[in-house]
Curated annotation (Swiss-Prot):
GO terms for cellular component: extracellular region; host cell plasma membrane; membrane; virion membrane. It comes from Bovine respiratory syncytial virus (strain 127) (BRS). The gene is G. GO terms for biological process: symbiont entry into host cell; virion attachment to host cell. Residues 187-198 are annotated as: Binding to host heparan sulfate. Residues 67-263 are extracellular. Glycans are attached at residues 72, 80, 87, 92, 105, 127, 139, 163, 199, 215, 231, 251, 253. Keywords: Disulfide bond, Glycoprotein, Host cell membrane, Host membrane, Host-virus interaction, Membrane, Secreted, Transmembrane, Transmembrane helix, Viral attachment to host cell, Viral immunoevasion, Virion, Virus entry into host cell. This is Major surface glycoprotein G.
């Protein structure tokens, strides 16, 4: 509290405390003179003053504690620059080559193992394997390009050896637009793919077309027995204009002659 004695709120608290002391002395004097009503009003006002003073002190302590907890000063530009300088530089080709040469120099500087019993010297086998790994890591990955076929349309033959089996790179057919060397690779990849079996579609034989001939409709009329008799009579009597037999003609000529003589 010694550091905060000059705060204006603390000064007001001191003044209120002194005033309360004088107020208590005055109340005691009034109580001696039997002025109870004035004493009661004075006590209530005193209680209100003490409560307000306690609330003010609590607020002051809370504000002081928060001020101590929060950092008052922000990091300066020099501190931020120092932090940036401490960050490691990004890996570039020059840095990578320098680290690669340092690793090779350390591996080559190791002395060979000497066998004292047989008197022969031999190099450590792990150095060769390490050098091979480092070289494989140092070489950048080259972009795979499809091999150029000189014949163009004729795809290469599939030479499958059981001992040395080589797998060709997968080339999607969507990237083969305008590249004649890429089309045989797509065909080879489709032939070698075990999962994608060729689907056989059976074509149904077309049925022969048959043209239906129109059928003749026969109409049957029911005839009565009287109509049948009339048709028979008509068939029996010869019609006029039809050539008759020679006997019939001779009979007609004789009848005509007899008629003329009688006249």
């Amino acid at each position: 509290m010694s550091n905060h004695t000059h705060h204006p709120k603390f000064k007001t608290l001191k003044r209120a405390w002194k005033a309360s002391k004088y107020f208590i002395v005055g109340l005691s004097c009034l109580y001696k003179f039997n002025l109870k009503s004035l004493v009661q009003t004075a006590l209530t006002t005193l209680a209100m003053i003490t409560l307000t003073s306690l609330v003010i002190t609590a607020i002051i302590y809370i504000s002081v504690g928060n001020a101590k907890a929060k950092p008052t000063s922000k990091p300066t530009t020099q501190q931020t620059q120092q932090l940036q300088n401490h960050t490691p530089p990004p890996l570039t080709e020059h840095n990578y080559k320098s680290t690669h040469t340092s690793i090779q120099s350390t591996t080559l500087s190791q002395p060979p193992n000497i066998d004292t019993t047989s008197g022969t010297t031999y190099g450590h086998p792990t150095n060769r394997t390490q050098n091979r790994k480092i070289k494989s890591q140092s070489t950048p990955l080259a972009t795979r390009k499809p091999p150029i076929n000189p014949l163009g349309s004729n795809p290469p033959e599939n030479h499958q050896d059981h001992n040395n089996s080589q797998t060709l790179p997968h080339v999607p057919c969507s990237t083969c637009e305008g590249n004649p060397a890429c089309s045989p690779l797509c065909q080879i990849e489709l032939e070698r793919a075990p999962s994608s079996a060729p689907t056989i579609t059976l074509k149904k034989a077309p049925k022969p077309k048959t043209t239906k001939k129109p059928t003749k409709t026969t109409i049957y009329h029911r005839t009565s027995p009287e109509a049948k008799l009339q048709t028979k009579k008509i068939m029996a009597t010869p019609q006029q204009g039809i050539l008759s037999s020679p006997e019939h003609q001779t009979n007609q000529s004789t009848t005509q002659i007899s008629q003329h003589t009688s006249i």
